[in-house]
Every structure is written in structure tokens, then in C-alpha cells.
């Protein structure tokens, strides 16, 4: 069974329940570096689509004014203008639809390509990690990074980030339009912005915090399940069923609590934001009605008046109020959309943090210079060769540039070796032994005595804390790990078959 992370210690990559903006920034940079051309086109389409999406609000004011004029002075002169305005607004919506279709299709390609590259990077990194990493990290937790965490990236890259940018630009454009039409009504909108900000900070912030915790709890639970599945026979042999169930219940309960809190806050968040938007709509309509019915007692201050009439104060028209109410709806809808996407972003940041944690792990170091080569003997001298001779030699380059060769014989010696899987707990003390070429040696002892540990040290799966291990008189730290392991034959206690033919499993790595 794999070694589990001790109770009370967070696994590698665990977050603290807060969204890390450094991780988000790194994620965005990584996506852009992988697909700079695609994302440049996407950004252009989003900006144009957002700006065009704001324009119809202005046309609503124009169309409403034309209808008012048609009702009072007749339709003969107004109908051509009204028709032109309607067709222009329809054309704007059509262009916005085309731009949206283009960038969503591009983002689908970018998302799947980015996930593909991320999985490749993770797997390549995993192949270069030392054995100690897999001892400290449950395999199920690593698998969760390949599945759940990458899936959270899919949603945020394909939907959340484009929506955040689009909605953010739309909100900015709508606010500018609101300032243009009426400064007094803008004060009502500012009140709504304050309420929405408080709701986002208090409710949305808590939801995001628990979504991050949910992602980490899910990784822990899956790691434990995978460990129990692989070690079920050991659990049965040692009658560990009840203890395993208690451990699982603890992890499952924690996952339940985190998921419950995350979804509880997320589920009440959108209704609250929606009702704040509805209340803002009513207050805006009420304030607009007061400005219209005040007969100039309450002046409407606007940039529009300054541009069209030369004065900043003028009565508010019904058409302006109608346009303003449409912008109000558009504003609240986009603010709610931005707030809703933050939960998905929080989950993705938690997943991205765990993925980057894996990618940032220090690969297994190898400072060896001695390599293994095929050889033959000529007049008592070892000579390297390319053909198969059944003989191998250690090849070492001296300081003067000449090559020294030493025949591979299999002489292994330990000199006062100390070792511990963790620095503060030594499991081998002053071990000295030798195995001469051709000699058969057996390590006999109870489980945990260190038999497998000694073979792991010979292969340099772990580095010793003190002492020396020499192989044919060469310090194994000076031998390249690939060549060292190539010279050794290992038969594992547990049989592990990879997907493929029997021959491929026998050859394993020499295909």
C-alpha cells in the first residue's frame, strides 16, 4: 500500500481556501503563450462584440423618440427613420452574434488544446519525479489532478474567462452610456452597485472559499479510495476494515461539509443578485418618473443635454427613461454573470494551483558522469564497441579528456550507510555489507526490516544520508542513474502488467 500523508498534514498542493490571483495570472499567461494568435483574435472579437452589444441601448432611445413623434405628428415623415433605426439595431445584433460565434468556436479549440498540453506536461513531469514524491503523495490525489482539476480548467478557460471579459467590458460601456443620459439616475445605479459589491464580497467570497476547499477535499478522498482499492487484500489480512471505514468517513464528511457550504452560498447568491437587480430597476423607473413629472423642478443633468442642447440641465424625456431602464437591466444581468463566474474561477484556480504544484516539483537529479557501454577485450585492454558482445564496461572521462574503462562485474559494497525516508527518522544505521561477483545473497527479516530499502538504495531510487555505496569500486553517486539501473535486474514482489502484449511486458522499456 502507498504511504499516506500523515493525519493533520495537507497534501502537496493543498490551498487555504482563498483564491490565489498569482495562480490565476500564471494560468492566463500559460494559455496565452500556448495560443497567442487564437487568443488575440478572441480578444478582438470579444471587445467588438461587447461594444456593439451596448449600442442597441442608444437605439432604443432613438426608436422610442420616433414612436412618440409618430403618434403626435404623423407617421409619414417618421416611418423611414424608424425603419432605418430598427434595421440598424438588427444589423448590430447580427454582427454581435457572428463575433460571438467566432470566438466561442476558437475558445473550444483553445480549451481542448490547452488541456491536452497540460496533461502532457503533467505526465512528462511525473515521469521525471523521484520515488519519494510518490511516497508522500497518494496516487489517487495525483489522479485527481489529471481528472477533476483539469476539468475545472476546461470550464474556466472555455466559458468563465471569456464571459468575465465580455461582461466586464459590457458593464463598463453601459456605465458610460448611463452617465451620458442622466447623472441623477446614475446615483440610483451607484446605490445598486454598492449593494451588489457587498453581496459579492460577503456571499460570493464565502462560496469561492469553500469551492477551493472542496477541490482539495475531493483530492484527499480520491487518494484514500485509490489506496484502499489497491490495498484491499492487506486490509482484509490485518482486519483493518473498521479503521479504514472510520478514516474514509472522516474524509467523506469533510468533503460533504465543504461541498455543502460551497453550494449553499452559490445557490443563494444568484437569487439575491437577481432581486437586487429587480429592485434597482424599480428604483430607477421611480426616479425617472419623478424627473419627468417634476416639470423641470428636478433638472436632469446629463452629457447628452450638453451635447445636443448646449446646457447640462434639461427635462428628462420618456424615451431617455425607456433607454435607461434597458441599460439598467443589461447592467445588472452582466454584473450577476460576472459574480456567478467567480465561483467557477475559484474552483479552477484551486485546480490550477494543484496542477502547477505538480509541474513545479523538482525533477530527480542526476549528476553522474560514469556511463555504461558495450565492450570487448583486445590484448588485455577493454575497448568500447557497438556490436553485442555480452560484455559491458563503465566508461569514465578523466580530467585530461582521456576515457577510462572498467569491466562491469557486479561487485556491490556498503560502507557505514545511514538512510531514512524522512530526514528526522533514520531506518538504516551504519550498514556495511558486500556482494561479490557471482555470489548469491539473501536478506531475511520481518516486514519493515529494510530488505527492499537496501535494493532501492543500490538502484538510487533514494539517496543515502551518510556513508558510501560502491559498485565495481565506483561510488554510485558518480554513475548516471539510467546506466546504473540498466546494469541491474529487478524482479518485483508485486506483479504489475502494463496494457499491451506479454512480450512487451517482458521487454518493458526496451521496445
Where are these regions (language model features)?
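An intracellular "coupling" helix at the cytosolic face of ABC transporter transmembrane type-1 domains
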Residues: 33-36, 131-132, 148-157, 161, ...
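Juxtamembrane helix-loop junctions of ABC transporter transmembrane domains
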Residues: 13-17, 44, 52-68, 92-139, ...
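Membrane-integrated ABC transporters
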Residues: 1-53, 68-88, 103-107, 111, ...
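Internal alpha-helical transmembrane segments of multi-pass membrane proteins, especially GPCRs
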Residues: 40, 44, 83, 87, ...
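Hydrophobic alpha-helical transmembrane segments of ABC transporter permease domains
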Residues: 25, 44, 99, 103, ...
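ABC-type nucleotide-binding domain
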Residues: 75, 375-511
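Helix-loop-helix
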Residues: 70-71, 177-191, 265-353, 358-359, ...
Amino acid at each position: 500500500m502507498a504511504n499516506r500523508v500523515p493525519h493533520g498534514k495537507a497534501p502537496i498542493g493543498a490551498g487555504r481556501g482563498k483564491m490565489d490571483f498569482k495562480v490565476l495570472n500564471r494560468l492566463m499567461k500559460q494559455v496565452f503563450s500556448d495560443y497567442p494568435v487564437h487568443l488575440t483574435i478572441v480578444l478582438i472579437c470579444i471587445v467588438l462584440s461587447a461594444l456593439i452589444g451596448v449600442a442597441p441601448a442608444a437605439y432604443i432611445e432613438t426608436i422610442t423618440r420616433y414612436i412618440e413623434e409618430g403618434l403626435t405628428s404623423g407617421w409619414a415623415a417618421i416611418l423611414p427613420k424608424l425603419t432605418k433605426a430598427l434595421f440598424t439595431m438588427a444589423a448590430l445584433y447580427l454582427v454581435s452574434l457572428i463575433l460571438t460565434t467566432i470566438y466561442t468556436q476558437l475558445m473550444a479549440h483553445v480549451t481542448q488544446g490547452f488541456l491536452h498540453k497540460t496533461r502532457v506536461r503533467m505526465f512528462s513531469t511525473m515521469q521525471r519525479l523521484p520515488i519519494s514524491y510518490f511516497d508522500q503523495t497518494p496516487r489517487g490525489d495525483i489522479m485527481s489532478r489529471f481528472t477533476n482539476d483539469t476539468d475545472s480548467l476546461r470550464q474556466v478557460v472555455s466559458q468563465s474567462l471569456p464571459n468575465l471579459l465580455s461582461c466586464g467590458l459590457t458593464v463598463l460601456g453601459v456605465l458610460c452610456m448611463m452617465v451620458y443620459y442622466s447623472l441623477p439616475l446614475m446615483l440610483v445605479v451607484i446605490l445598486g452597485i454598492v449593494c451588489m459589491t457587498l453581496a459579492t464580497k460577503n456571499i460570493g467570497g464565502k462560496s469561492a472559499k469553500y469551492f477551493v476547499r472542496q477541490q482539495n477535499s475531493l483530492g484527499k478522498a480520491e487518494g484514500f479510495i485509490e489506496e484502499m482499492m489497491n490495498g484491499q487484500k492487506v486490509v482484509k489480512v490485518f482486519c483493518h476494515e473498521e479503521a479504514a471505514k472510520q478514516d474514509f468517513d472522516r474524509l467523506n464528511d469533510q468533503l460533504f461539509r465543504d461541498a455543502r457550504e460551497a453550494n449553499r452560498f452559490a445557490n443563494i447568491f444568484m437569487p439575491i443578485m437577481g432581486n437586487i437587480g429587480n429592485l434597482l430597476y424599480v428604483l430607477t423607473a421611480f426616479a425617472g418618473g419623478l424627473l419627468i413629472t417634476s416639470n423641470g423642478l428636478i433638472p436632469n443633468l446629463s452629457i447628452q443635454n450638453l451635447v445636443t442642447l448646449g446646457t447640462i440641465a434639461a427635462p428628462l424625456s420618456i424615451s431617455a427613461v425607456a433607454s435607461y431602464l434597458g441599460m439598467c437591466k443589461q447592467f445588472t444581468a452582466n454584473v450577476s454573470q460576472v459574480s456567478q463566474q467567480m465561483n467557477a474561477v475559484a474552483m479552477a484556480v484551486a485546480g490550477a494551483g494543484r496542477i502547477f504544484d505538480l509541474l513545479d516539483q523538482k525533477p530527480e537529479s542526476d549528476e553522474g558522469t560514469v556511463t555504461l557501454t558495450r565492450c570487448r577485450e583486445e590484448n588485455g585492454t577493454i575497448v568500447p564497441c557497438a556490436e553485442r558482445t555480452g560484455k559491458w564496461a563503465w566508461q569514465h572521462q578523466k580530467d585530461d579528456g582521456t576515457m577510462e574503462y572498467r569491466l562491469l562485474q557486479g561487485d556491490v559494497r556498503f560502507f557505514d550507510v545511514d538512510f531514512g525516508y524522512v530526514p528526522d527518522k533514520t531506518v538504516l544505521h551504519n550498514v556495511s555489507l558486500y556482494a561479490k561477483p557471482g555470489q548469491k545473497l539473501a536478506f531475511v527479516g520481518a516486514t519493515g526490516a529494510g530488505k527492499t530499502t537496501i535494493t532501492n538504495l543500490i538502484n538510487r531510487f533514494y539517496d543515502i544520508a551518510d556513508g558510501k555505496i560502491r559498485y565495481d569500486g565506483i561510488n554510485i553517486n558518480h554513475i548516471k542513474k539510467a546506466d546504473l539501473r540498466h546494469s541491474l535486474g529487478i524482479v518485483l514482489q508485486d506483479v504489475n502488467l502494463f496494457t499491451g502484449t506479454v512480450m512487451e511486458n517482458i521487454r518493458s522499456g526496451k521496445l
